Amino acid sequence: MANLQVSGILEKFQMTGKDKDYRYMATSDLLNELNKDSFKIDLDLEVRLSSIILQQLDDVAGDVSGLAVKCLAPLVKKVGEERIVEMTNKLCDKLLHGKDQHRDTASIALRTVVAQIAPTLAPSILVTLTPQMIGGISGQGMSSGIKCECLEIMCDVVQKYGSLMTDDHEKLLNTLLLQLGCNQATVRKKTVTCIASLASSLSDDLLAKATVEVVKNLSNRNAKSEITRTNIQMIGALCRAVGYRFGTHLGNTVPVLINYCTSASENDEELREYSLQALESFLLRCPRDISPYCDEILNLTLEYISYDPNFTDNMEEDTDNETLEDEEDDESANEYTDDEDASWKVRRAAAKCLAGLIVSRSEMLTKVYQEACPKLIDRFKEREENVKMDVFNTFIDLLRQTGNVTKGQTDTDESSPKWLLKQEVSKIVKSINRQLREKSVKTKVGAFSVLRELVVVLPDCLADHIGSLVPGIERALNDKSSTSNLKIEALVFTKLVLASHAPPVFHPYIKALSSPVLAAVGERYYKVTAEALRVCGELVRVVRPSTAGMGFDFKPFVHPIYNAIMSRLTNQDQDQEVKECAITCMGLVISTFGDQLRAELPSCLPVLVDRMGNEITRLTAVKAFSVIATSPLHINLSCVLDHLIAELTGFLRKANRVLRQATLITMNTLVTAYGDKIGSEAYEVILVELSSLISVSDLHMTALALELCCTLMTGKSCSENISLAVRNKVLPQALTLVKSPLLQGQALLDLQKFFEALVYHANTSFYTLLESLLSCAKPSPQSGGVPKQALYSIAQCVAVLCLAAGDKNCSSTVKMLMEILKDDSGTNSAKQHLALLSLGEIGRRKDLSAHAGIETIVIESFQSPFEEIKSAASYALGNIAVGNLSNYLPFILDQIDNQQKKQYILLHSLKEVIVRQSVDKADFQNSSVEKILALLFNHCESEEEGVRNVVAECLGKMALIEPEKLVPALQVRTTSPAAFTRATVVTAVKYSVVERPEKLDEIIFPQISSFLMLIKDGDRHVRRAAVSALSTFAHYKPNLIKGLLPELLPLLYDQTVIKKELIRTVDLGPFKHVVDDGLELRKAAFECVFTLVDSCLDQVNPSSFIVPFLKSGLEDHYDLKMLCHLILSLLADKCPSAVLAVLDSLVEPLHKTISFKPKQDAVKQEHDRNEDMIRSALRAISSLDRINGVDYSHKFKGLMGDMKRSVPLWEKFQTIRNE
């Protein structure tokens, strides 16, 4: 049927003759038929269709020939190879030898064919197309128009099929290189683009040939300047196209470009511009190989960022005197301008090149601050606005990079970027203030962007400069010529600066600041209004930072702020963002100024409650009441309290999890502050709702619900009815919860407080509760035994319960638990297990020495044949000792000396003692310390790894208590002939590192290298321990190791490499098994790199790590691949330019990972593991896809294309990208 319709359409073409409209309609009908999925075609129709469409391409009516071109796209997909080759030949003939007026159409048609042909047909088409295009480019007498068309078509061809035409690469490259010397600028420009597109698929030899030829052209000093400029552009384009592969050619190209920069004539600005652009490409795409030239490039950018030979700046230094303002504005307006002056291009290129160096060389930040920062600040006065924006952006890059690499570090070191930045703050503010007085809105927006980034990096740096900045903020908000963008930027900065500085700093300027901000609240544009309301929130805190008097009279500002916000709060016809900001801000106003707004509260509070009825503003209103309830002013809520509690109780039933969490927090604050004003009936309803929220499936919600229960029980209004409701509704849920192995963290702490409150405040029988808790440990027929982790939770609740019930009840419970141990000795019952853990938990909190022989009873459980019982006994003994060190520590030490067979268990008991003491900072007696150290050092060489690990942890925690004794003792043993001893002492150092500042830090700092340099030890166990220690230092105390990293990093990277000598084959009879003894070491090394990238980026040179080490890891064992995917994602986020430079080399291992399919007979575990691996790789690919400039990599684009063609893979990728 479709063929009959097409035949009818073809007959129309023969009948239409000279009538253009008929020809148009016939072509349109044909296009519609070709686009139908049901359209099928036979050989005869192929010939007729292709002939008619090619004929229509020559139609004198442009709209008809345009439709004919569109017909080619679906036609190419539906005709055979022979027909496509025939059409390609005819189109080439039209392009090369046809009439001039048909050339454009033929070119577009050819590009359409190239875009649509299937990859399987591409080789046949290329055999026909490529020689003719090469002929069109190089042929004698060919016009520049034909050359340009051929170059554009070849550009499309090599971009899509470059890897399929390797046989033509050399001939095509030679042809293109000759065109770089063409007299026509358009031909040269398109040649540069074509060579760059071809470059990514060229072999290394041909790439070298291209580079050598271009450098040779540049060496010809007699060449025309425009030819030289083209060749410089070619160098930059090649580098951008091939990335890290260009690195080997930098030795030949960088000196030539620097020479052109410095020796170009004064009028040849474009030569300098292109040279600097090429150098920027080198910095971003070849960060590893450009390293030797970075200092020289830095000096070059600093020279040319102020290059302005036609203009002399004789203006005197800026002052902050406001009387000069008008004069300066006039000066700005009448600045030197010259349409022929192109020096601004050089300055812009220099600024961008400097930005490239800043973002790619984090290790040079200190040098950049010392040499470039003052120059950049000086260039804020740049007279060309576009260049000024680039200078601002470069400085913002510097600030952001400072924030990235100094995250979590102190700024006391005089060589640290943050410290150096602090020294420049005054100059920055002075220069920015001048920019804020400029007339240009764009300039002022850029200036505020710089200030905003400055405050993000150095939150408290503007305290001494607020007075000079306020006029600029006022002008930005008050000036009628100000745009919304400028107002938003000024408001965002104001909010940041108010939030990050001490309130008294702003008190002299509150009047000047508040007026324009409150005016902005009334703006029509919602984004300005929302931002102004956020500023008001910060302003409220600044105006009255505490209810105690601070010598500042805040009262004049209360009603203006309240009125401005109230007008927005009551206006329903506005954007959701404004509504939410108004609610949040009003919550702060009432919380802070409530005592001054008593007359207004009865009209304001009902509006906030009303906003809780609207689903859009409900969550924000709930949070606002939490702020009001925590106010030290104890705001009178009587007019809305009952309604408020009823609304909140209803929200506990809502499906919205975030709303339920916010509701629990708000209810807790309300019950704490207004508990005696809330009726017990309301509490009983609340408790019913709370019971349904206590579940192991949501521990955060559970913790909040339990906290509210405790508040209800401990409040003044706790009645017998409330206690009964808690026992009947909540207690059963709590007893179910305590049996879960997943219970941990805040939920476990709140559960302990819940049991404590039950005994203290809710008149609950201690023995009933205790029996209920102990019963939780009994195995049930349905669920079997209670998990080990649950027993620990139950034991902690038992201990808290006993202490809350008083000494008498506590003592009787301890006796009962001891009886259980006597009666059940030799069994593996949960009852005995729980008894041991409970004694440990009680003993840790209370001295149990009054119970004679308790230690002997506990230690008898060491004889148990069951490991769980022995472990629990060890835990119990150590914790009981914590309750009375002088009584029990000598006993444990004596037992370790005399009980050889029980040493491992006893060492765990000692570990419990030491770990608890290191946290509580309790001191041991000297005699005990000496005895403990002697004992621990004696066990350093134990054959059992478990013993050595316990010893290392004990030594590490002892170092926190006695650093002066431990650090030298550990250091001495780093040179021990026994490898196990060396490994144990470096592991001990790892355990001594904690997040909080310690006296140990200053003692270990000078000695730290002797421990970490064991990374080059001959024994792999020692190396692994050193790597693990380095990782821990990098995470918690990066400042201690920064100075060692230049020496440590190459050694660390070496540990990521597969070592053949560590791979062995074990003969298992029927089959052989390969064992890789270096796997755990490599895993530890990659984990350490991940930590270093996160905490010490300014010391890590990512370029030297990614290739070859990360690339190798992406092809290593399953566990290491997953780690490397994480590292790659982190690097893509923190230093994208370094990743972009070597991206092509990373695509293949990622492609292999996502394409891998397990064998058909693989077990489910292998399939699951492979799915995890694919998802891990897709996350890394998603991170790479977000890098700006990733489109330069044809290989990565190919990877994304392959993924799109695989529907299941693309769906997984989209899911991950949307997470």
Curated annotation (Swiss-Prot):
Disruption phenotype: Developmental phenotypes such as dwarfism, organ defects, short inflorescences and mishaped leaves. Low fertility and reduced responses to hormones. The modification N-acetylalanine is found at residue 2. One of its GO terms (cellular component) is plasma membrane. HEAT repeats lie at residues 44-81, 83-119, 209-244, 248-288, 327-363, 367-404, 423-460, 464-503, 599-636, 639-676, 808-848, 850-883, 927-964, 966-998, 1002-1039, 1043-1079, 1101-1137, 1141-1180. Highly expressed in roots. Expressed in stems, flowers and siliques. Keywords: Acetylation, Repeat, Transcription, Transcription regulation, Ubl conjugation pathway. GO terms for biological process: response to auxin; SCF complex assembly; vegetative to reproductive phase transition of meristem; xylem and phloem pattern formation. Pfam families: TIP120. Changing residue 1069 to D: In eta2-1; reduced response to auxin. Residues 314-340 have a biased composition (Acidic residues). InterPro entries: ARM-like, ARM-type_fold, CAND1/CAND2, TATA-bd_TIP120. Residues 311-340 are annotated as: Disordered. Belongs to the CAND family. Key assembly factor of SCF (SKP1-CUL1-F-box protein) E3 ubiquitin ligase complexes that promotes the exchange of the substrate-recognition F-box subunit in SCF complexes, thereby playing a key role in the cellular repertoire of SCF complexes. Acts as a F-box protein exchange factor. Required for SCF(TIR1) function. Modulates SCF(TIR1) function through its interactions with the CUL1 subunit. Represses photomorphogenesis by promoting HY5 degradation in darkness. Interacts with CUL1 and CUL4. Binds unneddylated CUL1, but cannot bind CUL1 once it has been neddylated. PANTHER family: TIP120. This is Cullin-associated NEDD8-dissociated protein 1. The lineage of its organism: Eukaryota, Viridiplantae, Streptophyta, Embryophyta, Tracheophyta.
